[in-house]
């Protein structure tokens, strides 16, 4: 309560998202998007990382959970200093980090088109997607992939969401290493969007997905009727 500047959410004592807890936020008077972390096996942190301005490229030394708020190989946000980091995934192993996927939603219940957002990898994912532990013998190959899947819901009763995908790691060991535009207009009008992180089969071991379900994002652009510029 009482926090009005995005930068006030950023921890000053380290780059570990869990050290400052999870929180909800709302972009009121602009995109009208609200976000609430979900609760699961690991508490509130099961579905949130946090707002950040931490960046770096030393993926071998800073590619662990202590740097989970760090965007990889960029100099700041897509436009400006700050950006957001997302954590959350569900799989069929029973070891997923939460019981439901953390969503964006329009707080007023109006369905709108989210035109696009800008995304990139975190240093943590870049490291772990090369070679991860966590109950797995995974080592990157030319067939390894890691993607974000977005599910768009037009209403609370919608049981058949529209889907969009974005590959943070594509075949041929092709990583995203800069802010990249992700077209979400294919989802159509939505009241909420849920995100999941999904790896190729080789990334799964005894405890589910061995690569952490993170990505960094910025500048979520929303279409409003009668306006020619995205908010």
Feature locations, PLM:
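Short catalytic/ligand-binding loop motif for oxyanion handling, primarily in non-cytosolic enzymes
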Residues: 122-127, 201-204
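Terminal, low-complexity interaction segments
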Residues: 145-230
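Short edge beta-strand/loop segments characteristic of extracellular beta-sandwich folds
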Residues: 118-120, 137
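Short coil-to-beta strand junction motifs in C2/discoidin
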Residues: 128-148
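Short acidic, Gly/Pro-enriched loop/turn segments at secondary-structure junctions
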Residues: 125-128, 228-230
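Short secondary-structure capping micro-motifs at structural edges
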Residues: 99-107, 131-138
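Extended extracellular/luminal ectodomain segments enriched in beta-structured repeat modules
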Residues: 109-116, 189-190
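N-terminal targeting leaders for non-cytosolic proteins
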Residues: 1-102, 109
